Amino acid sequence: MEVAAKLFGARLSAQKARLVADQVRGKRVEEALDILTFSPKKASSIIKKVLESAIANAEHNEGLDVDELKVATICVDEGPTMKRIKPRAKGRADRIFKRTCHITVKVAEE
């Protein structure tokens, strides 16, 4: 049985979040939490919160054993992009893209 947790509109790019997601995909939950705890990336703390939420959902909603869980799937999709303006010289302006992403973590028993 797979149990999911989702985060919509996380304030980091999907490209950077996928670097961290690839490290924990398919790992046991305890090992994945260790990897995320000691990773220096910004995405690791965000993905760790979503993973902890999925673990709590599995434990409380479905009654699954936490020691038997593994990260079944983890998906990072692009979210809406906020567009901002940065003034430049001689009346010009540059666009700034503030990217967001949607993170989905599914855990399942081994």
UniProtKB/Swiss-Prot annotation:
Family annotation (CDD domains): Ribosomal_L22
Quaternary state and interactors: Part of the 50S ribosomal subunit.
An annotated Gene Ontology molecular function: rRNA binding
Name the record gives this protein: Large ribosomal subunit protein uL22
GO CC terms of this entry: cytosolic large ribosomal subunit
Family annotation (Pfam families): Ribosomal_L22
Domain of life: Bacteria
